[in-house]
């Protein structure tokens, strides 16, 4: 078991969370360790616990009834405690709980966690939000021209990220956004061997390159963008006093999109990026809002719908955040939840006007799967599966090398997941439509909006789509046995074959994504996207979007091998033309075209080697 972490007070989970006795309902005055807040800390501690979780998982797979599995487990636990009492009595032991813990891994939960509640009453909170919305409406009226059209000036953090790039693309074609200032750090280019500084790319240089990669090439398209130096982990976002003074008199909105989306980051790194970065952005926006004569309307915080953690099939509501009964999958989710609490505090105590926008798991855009070169999150396992299939299909080397490559590829095609587990995947273009809609709707101030879907996709459907599109035979492994038995064995084998990178990759895929492909996933409530933001009631077809992700990663990115962003941008422009042609020919979305027909179309119209249209 890992040693307790010695954290500085400003990083302590106790700032946000209370540990409460189930016996007395009193708050336990003891330090909460970050690892105690993750699901990994509370499972696999006993061989019987492993077997019980495996039994529940298989029962869900067989029946599709999660409530039945929980009821069966409650009965088994009750029998285990009763058996421990009998054994303790027969052997003269005084503490049956020690017996149950030693023999069966059973333990009564003695405490629970909850978020610290703000002292304001519900009525006071609602009144505060109504006041902030009214202020926002008045500020938005000031931002309109004589014809009543909004003239919005937006500052964006995280513009070089996956979602940030889509914000730039859509903003470029939005006439109501007349200026967008993008915070971007200078980039140092160093010699790989010596570490010597070769050159530094300024924010303006990086911005020009970024706009080119987004196909924004004309002076008209580029004229609304300005790139300035900044760093969200620094006070005042690292913006110079001169720039900040100018922004105070011009900006109507701040979109804080910068974050760490690494699911395997340690607590301290996740906290610094997600909580400290959010606090810096909130203080920055408060300074804009409080400036005399400021045109500032609202701050938009981009969070995640997974701030609700492992709720186990309970609906995660948009209007509240509670500590999840079954903890968090990782520190990314936990620290984003902490950042959401800080955001609420700034609204209630400091009067900052904020809209909280919470995307689910964001994937490539809905028409063509375009992901702007991203290779993380859902793209990572798809790329692994694709490369594994190629290794099986076209083995190189002598008999030994071919055998080893085949074995490695088959290992890579084992994925932990229950067939019925549901993932909430949402295309990036839908997410950004929601973000830019929120910019124009002051009524969204004080609201938390899930930019998620009501047509979730199951692990089984993902497996089938990958098989159809990539030809990969994915084996869904029972998550608990995979985590506790299969993965350690595979890691030993791979280490013996001198393949530590593959072993590490498999371990990462299992630990990072396994939590999202287990049964008992939360259901993220949706509705504010339509009611508050005015988005269409019909959300994107998730299966079509995931199918396009697979196709895009196969043809455009070559499963992550194409890393040059300029080349990816060129390919994605060709790809977009292809998808428009396909949709015109088929009369429907490209994602609805069968795998066989899609491949035939690509072979007809695309020279795959040079990636140009035939």
Predicted features along the sequence, with ranges:
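A hydrophobic C-terminal alpha-helical subdomain
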Residues: 388-418, 484-537, 568, 574-575, ...
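NAD(P)-dependent short-chain dehydrogenase/reductase
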Residues: 313-315, 345-423, 428-433, 437
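N-terminal Rossmann/SDR dinucleotide-binding element
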Residues: 105-253, 257, 267, 292-293, ...
């Amino acid at each position: 078991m890992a040693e307790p972490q010695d954290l500085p007070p400003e990083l302590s989970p106790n700032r946000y969370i209370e540990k409460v006795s189930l016996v007395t309902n009193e708050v336990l005055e003891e330090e909460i360790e970050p690892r105690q807040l993750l699901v990994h800390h509370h499972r696999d501690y006993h061989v019987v616990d492993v077997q019980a979780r495996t039994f529940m998982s298989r029962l869900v797979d067989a029946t599709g009834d999660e409530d039945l599995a929980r009821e069966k487990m409650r009965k088994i636990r009750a029998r285990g405690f009763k058996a421990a009492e009998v054994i303790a009595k027969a052997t003269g032991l005084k503490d049956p709980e020690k017996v149950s813990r030693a023999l069966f891994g059973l333990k009564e939960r003695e405490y629970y966690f909850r978020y610290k509640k703000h002292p304001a009453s519900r009525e006071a909170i609602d009144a505060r939000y109504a006041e902030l919305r009214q202020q926002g409406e008045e500020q938005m009226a000031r931002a309109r021209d004589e014809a009543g059209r909004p003239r919005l000036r937006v500052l964006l953090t995280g513009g070089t990220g996956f979602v940030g790039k889509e914000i730039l693309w859509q903003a470029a074609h939005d006439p109501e956004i007349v200026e967008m200032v993008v915070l971007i750090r200078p980039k140092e280019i160093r010699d790989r061997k010596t570490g010597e500084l070769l050159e530094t790319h300024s924010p303006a240089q990086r911005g020009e390159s970024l706009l080119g990669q987004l196909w924004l090439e004309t002076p008209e398209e580029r004229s609304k963008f300005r790139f300035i130096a900044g760093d969200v982990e620094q006070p005042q976002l690292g913006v110079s006093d001169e720039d900040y003074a100018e922004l105070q008199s011009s900006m109507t909105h701040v979109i804080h999109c910068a974050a760490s989306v690494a699911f395997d980051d340690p607590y301290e790194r996740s906290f610094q990026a997600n909580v400290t970065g959010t606090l810096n952005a909130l203080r920055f926006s408060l300074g804009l809002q409080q400036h005399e004569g400021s045109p500032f309307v609202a701050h938009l915080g981009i969070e995640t719908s997974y701030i609700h953690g492992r709720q186990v099939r309970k609906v995660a509501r948009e209007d509240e955040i509670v500590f999840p009964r079954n903890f968090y999958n990782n520190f990314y989710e936990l620290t984003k939840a902490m950042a959401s609490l800080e955001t609420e505090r700034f609204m209630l105590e400091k009067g900052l006007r904020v809209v909280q926008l919470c995307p689910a798991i964001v994937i490539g855009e809905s028409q063509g799967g375009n992901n702007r070169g991203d290779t993380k999150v859902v793209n990572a396992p798809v790329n692994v599966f694709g490369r594994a299939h190629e290794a099986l299909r076209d083995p190189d080397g002598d008999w030994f090398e071919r055998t080893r490559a085949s074995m490695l590829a088959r290992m890579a095609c084992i994925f932990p997941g229950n067939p019925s587990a549901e993932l909430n995947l949402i295309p990036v273009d839908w997410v950004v439509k929601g973000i830019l809609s929120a910019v124009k709707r002051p009524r969204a101030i004080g609201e938390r909006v899930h930019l998620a879907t009501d047509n979730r996709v199951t692990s089984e459907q993902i497996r089938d789509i990958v098989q159809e599109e990539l030809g990969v035979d994915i084996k869904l492994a029972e998550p608990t046995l995979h985590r506790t038995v299969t993965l350690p064995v595979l890691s030993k084998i791979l280490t013996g074959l001198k393949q530590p990178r593959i072993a590490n990759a498999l371990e990462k895929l299992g630990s990072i994504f396994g939590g999202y492909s287990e049964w008992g996933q939360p259901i993220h409530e949706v509705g504010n996207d339509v009611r508050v933001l005015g988005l269409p009631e019909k959300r994107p077809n998730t299966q079509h979007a995931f199918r396009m992700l697979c196709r895009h990663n196969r043809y455009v990115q070559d499963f992550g091998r194409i890393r040059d962003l300029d080349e990816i941008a060129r390919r994605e422009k060709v790809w977009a033309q292809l998808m428009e042609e396909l949709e015109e020919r088929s009369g429907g979305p490209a994602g609805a075209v069968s795998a066989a027909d899609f491949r035939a179309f690509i072979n007809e119209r695309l020279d795959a080697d040079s990636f140009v249209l035939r």
